[in-house]
């Protein structure tokens, strides 16, 4: 009888956990092509990344199911995003990852056609930091005009990048290009643009908060801050406390930025849930409600 009761209790706790953590929107997920896995990678904690593109997709979708992630903005090459969308088009919100305006042979004409063909739902992640540019540079303006015209949300990287990246794959990356203040001209020139910054400015989270104060249309995700390393988790705590104090939590959205490590999804969720200064309502808003409002999802 005791054993049976324990089994029932375990089942109840699992069910309660699933109910209490229902419906998450992840505003920052990455898809990759096979070539991205040619060089093995380990994270800050020494954990190896997924072995290949198929394993990475499966591990990420398994996490979606486990943690009730009902929608996810998937950013990657058009080819990889199409692969993910074909697996679960109801869950996947199609993004496109660009560090330079001409990545994948892209130009504004091709991009506008993709928008018309409903092959892109979010313009991002836009990694201007990695190419040593800013979203206010002239080369990006045709894309922004299209996004404003068709009401396509824009997601732009802020903060730094991977340690040593400037010495290898992103030689033009400089920390100064991660400052959210570099987006101010975009916010001024495109007042109707739906835009969210990624990583809440990271090192410059105070700048992110100040922009959110001046420009009430600006949202942010807190992706990568919740799991990748202790310094980023400190940024997450400080940013969220300040955003709560200022009354801006209603524009803060959950994101993972799992990169090659899908385990970061669960770790991010658990870390956010562990923050005792956030109420249950705060967490529900960050996990789902704020993103649903930003994305204008139908109820």
Each predicted region: which residue ranges?
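Bacterial N-terminal signal peptides
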Residues: 5-15
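Mid-to-C-terminal alpha-helical segments outside catalytic/metal-binding sites
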Residues: 2-4, 21-30, 36, 43-67, ...
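Catalytic pocket-lining loop regions of alpha/beta-barrel enzymes
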Residues: 121-122, 136-253
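Histidine-centered catalytic micro-motifs
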Residues: 24-34, 155-159, 197
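Active-site environment of divalent metal-dependent phosphoester hydrolases
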Residues: 32-34, 79-82, 101, 130-131, ...
